[in-house]
Amino acid sequence: MLHNNMITCNYVTCNYVTWIKGRFLMEYVEAVRDIKQINSIKKYLKKHSERDYVLFVFGINTGLKITEMLDIKVDDVFEKENCVKDFYLLSHKETLKEVYLNHKVKQAILHYVHTLHLSGENFLFKSSKTDKPITRQQAYRIIHHAAEAVGIEGKIGTNSMRKTFGYHAYKRGIAISLLQKHFNHSTPSETLKYLGISKDEKIRTEIDVNL
């Protein structure tokens, strides 16, 4: 039985199920492929909410599920007061998975935590009304409305952040086998479908070691 706050995701069609006005609404979401559109969303969120900006930057740079992101506390990503960790340790099926936090993520987190004076025990994506994290539905609305506000016509939701991470990682030369493992998919073809990439589609690879 589905509950009011449940969101499910099929890895091929990636449907979100949300309860709206007495009925369940299913919606397919896509990656944001255009870098200019990504930057437009960032700019919009930065202007309206530091927390929401960090949510988006964190999501598109780590590829974590929204449920995994909302569980994070400030102490989970900080080594000491002014130092964000290089890797966030995610508990996954009784094992620890290292999730790399790049410079953009670190910079966004550091500024956000210090600006809002968050303490170590606070959830990173804390509700403005309670000590709990924002809900999945609220996170969906944040990302969806930001995309609409900057004129993106595609279907964009929280899982778009995860797909955006995967699409751009693949475009920049990351092997599909590594992305398959990251997303916990059964086959490479499942990952390609999840990212919205057809087998015949030609993606211009941009391998940049940034030395």
Please provide the spans of the model-predicted regions:
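Conserved catalytic core of the tyrosine transesterase superfamily
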Residues: H3-L211
